[in-house]
């Protein structure tokens, strides 16, 4: 099994989500090292925003950053409206993906994304704690 994955693609629908990764085995977790979004059509769109969401995406909001929600683990924006393009990329350093990962497009247009995942080994206790946190339960 690989120790890292690079996932990249496009979400064509505005305010939509896409499952981009499913963890293949028990006692294996995945950590996001890098996440960035940018407009799918750089000529027509000057702004885009996205976030990474682990586990069930049904609770994900497409309109805000959800920094309070433990399933939201990374946020990225891109704006080309100024002379120099600017972006903000934030990754929660205390997260482990144990089931699945979704990218959420919070923009009114299509967005491109790239994510780098690194594999980590989990003992049984760590896996249970990660699953509880992923399901938004108190730990």
Regions found by a protein language model. Give the residues of each.
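Beta-strand-centric surfaces of beta-sandwich/beta-rich domains
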Residues: 1-31, 36-139
């Amino acid at each position: 099994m690989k120790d890292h994955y690079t996932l990249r693609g496009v979400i064509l629908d505005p305010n939509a989500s896409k499952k981009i990764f499913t963890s293949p085995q028990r006692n294996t977790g995945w950590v996001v090292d890098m996440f960035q979004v940018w407009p799918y059509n750089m000529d027509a769109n000057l702004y885009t925003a996205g976030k990474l969401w682990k586990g069930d995406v049904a609770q994900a909001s497409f309109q805000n950053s959800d920094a309070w929600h433990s399933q939201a683990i990374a946020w990225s924006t891109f704006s080309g409206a100024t002379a120099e393009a600017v972006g903000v990329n934030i990754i929660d350093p205390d997260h482990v993906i144990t089931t699945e990962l979704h990218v959420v497009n919070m923009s009114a247009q299509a967005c491109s994304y790239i994510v780098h995942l690194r594999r980590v080994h989990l003992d049984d206790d760590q896996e249970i704690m990660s699953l509880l946190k992923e399901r938004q339960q108190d730990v």
